[in-house]
Structures are given as C-alpha cells and as structure tokens.
A protein has these predicted regions:
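Short, solvent-exposed alpha-helical "recognition" segments
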Residues: 138-150
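Short, charged amphipathic recognition helices of the HTH superfamily
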Residues: 106-125
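Intrinsically disordered, low-complexity, charge-dense segments enriched in Lys/Arg
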Residues: 161, 165-173
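Short Lys/Arg-enriched helix C-cap and helix-to-coil transition segments
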Residues: 147-164
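Positively charged, polyanion-binding regions of nucleic-acid-associated proteins
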Residues: 91-110
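Short, basic interhelical loop/turn and adjoining N-cap
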Residues: 122-137, 160-162
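Extended non-catalytic interaction/regulatory regions in multidomain proteins
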Residues: 79, 84-95
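Long, low-complexity interaction regions most often at the N-terminus
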Residues: 1-80, 84
Length: 173
C-alpha cells in the first residue's frame, strides 16, 4: 500500500475528492486508475527519509492503486511538493468545473430550474461545506450574465449590420 497526503485548496474540493474516491474503512481515500487518479500517481515523489506530515485544514490522505509505478514507492516515503500540489489543485478544480458544467447543462436541457440543479449537484456529490451552496449559485449567475452579455453584443452587431445594409446613413449618424 502506498499512502500519501495531499493538501487541497478548499473544503469543497476536499469533499469532491471524497466523492471521486470514497474512503475505505480506515478513512483513507482509495484512488482509482481513472484520469485524475493517473495524474495523482504521475506527480508522486519518493523520499529516502520520512516526510513530515502535512498540516492545515484541507489535508486528505490518499491510498494509491497498486501498479508498476506505485510499486516503486513501497520502499520510499511518498509525498507531493508544493508545485505538485498546486498543479494537482488546478487539475482537480478543472475536473470539478467540467463535472459541474456538464451536470448543469444536462439539467438545463431537461428543463429543471437553476436552484434545483445546483441543489441536486451538491447533494449527489456530497458537497456539504458551508460555502459550497453560495459558490455554485454565484458561479451559475456569473455564467448567465456572461452569456446574456454575449447574446446582447451579437444582437447589437447584427442590428448595425442590417441597418447599414438598409440605410446607408447608419444607426449612429
């Protein structure tokens, strides 16, 4: 068994990791050989001397799958350095964003309301941290505003094009 600690950037991402890799009986998250699991294995480093335990609010303990790469770490103390953790946090946030966006679009296409989709996502992914509800609702609102602005700009450009085609003087003249 190869166990390693990873410090994630927020409680929401720590909860999401627990969704991706359900904990075993001892509470350690069992990493699978999926895409993100392979990334976790790829960033793993080994030390000949014991590594100090990570401290902080959002430290999760991971158990790596046994494969050709992780077998090498059975005789070493595995760890992630700060750069590895930063990269893995960025990748985890991207996986989270893709999962949320796909879930939201699917719910939207089925005609569900924004609040219901976000609530269902939070419940299904077991994201019970206090700020998760607000963070996801604000994200949906900001994306909605950006979409509205993009549509508005396209309509304005279309109106100017049509007006210039019809009236050689143009709208602004």
């Amino acid at each position: 068994m190869v166990d390693v600690e990873l410090k994630v950037s927020s409680q929401m991402l720590a909860d999401f990791l627990t969704f991706l890799y359900p904990p075993e009986e001892d509470g350690i998250l069992a990493v699978k050989s999926d895409v993100f699991g392979k990334l976790l294995v790829a960033h793993l480093r080994g030390s000949d001397i014991p590594v100090t335990a990570r401290s902080g609010d959002f430290v999760v303990k991971l158990r790596m799958p046994i494969n050709d790469i992780t077998r090498h770490f059975e005789k070493l103390w595995p760890y992630y350095n700060e750069a590895d953790e930063a990269s893995l946090n960025m990748a985890l946030a991207a996986v989270f964003d893709m999962d949320f966006t796909g879930y939201y679009r699917k719910g939207e296409s089925l005609g569900y309301q924004k609040k219901d989709i976000v609530d269902a996502f939070i419940t299904s992914r077991k994201l019970f941290s206090a700020d998760c509800f607000d963070v996801l609702h604000k994200r949906v609102y900001r994306k909605g505003q950006a979409s509205f602005e993009a549509i508005k700009q396209r309509l304005i450009r279309k109106a100017y094009y049509i007006d210039e085609s019809i009236d050689y003087k143009g709208l602004g003249k």
